[in-house]
């Protein structure tokens, strides 16, 4: 926080943009990490249980309009392609790409899904992702259609208009 108060734009691996959004600079995924993931998922698949992996975007990938020019636009997409290729090698694994609700729409729409000064989504973003994951699982017959969370399952809070799950 001291670095940011002094006017620095980069502090502790985070970039502070003029309007106060914090973003991390994307870094390439290491092949060794993908190999370790493949191995772990293959071992988990040997347990003869349904295995699902959900691909979700990082904050800076969803709010790509805010990224400074010196961020590589290709890094996130290259990481996703490498991950998808690695996951395709794992037998019996269902892969769900649940990024659509978080990366489409206007910047103002997408900003509603993330904390401004943290690096992950808020309750609204978590709901959008969970709904997309459940929708795809229901479409594949893995779960019942009635299991897909709906906006009616949440109540508006008096503070900030956030919805909270009431289960």
What do these predicted regions represent?
Residues 1-167:
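Extracellular glycan-modifying ectodomains
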């Amino acid at each position: 926080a001291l670095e940011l108060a002094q006017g620095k734009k980069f502090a502790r691996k985070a970039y502070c943009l003029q309007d106060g959004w914090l973003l991390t600079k994307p870094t390439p995924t290491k092949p060794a990490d993908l190999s370790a993931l493949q191995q772990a998922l293959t071992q988990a698949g040997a347990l003869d249980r349904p295995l699902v992996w959900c691909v979700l975007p990082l904050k800076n990938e969803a709010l790509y309009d805010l990224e400074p020019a010196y961020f590589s636009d290709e890094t996130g997409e290259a990481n996703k392609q490498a991950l998808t290729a690695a996951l395709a090698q794992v037998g019996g694994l269902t892969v769900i790409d649940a990024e659509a609700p978080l990366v489409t729409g206007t910047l103002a729409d997408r900003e509603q899904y993330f904390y401004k000064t943290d690096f992950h989504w808020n309750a609204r973003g978590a709901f959008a992702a969970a709904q997309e994951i459940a929708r795809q699982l229901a479409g594949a017959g893995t779960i019942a259609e009635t299991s897909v969370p709906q906006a009616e399952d949440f109540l508006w809070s008096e503070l900030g208009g956030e919805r909270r799950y009431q289960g």
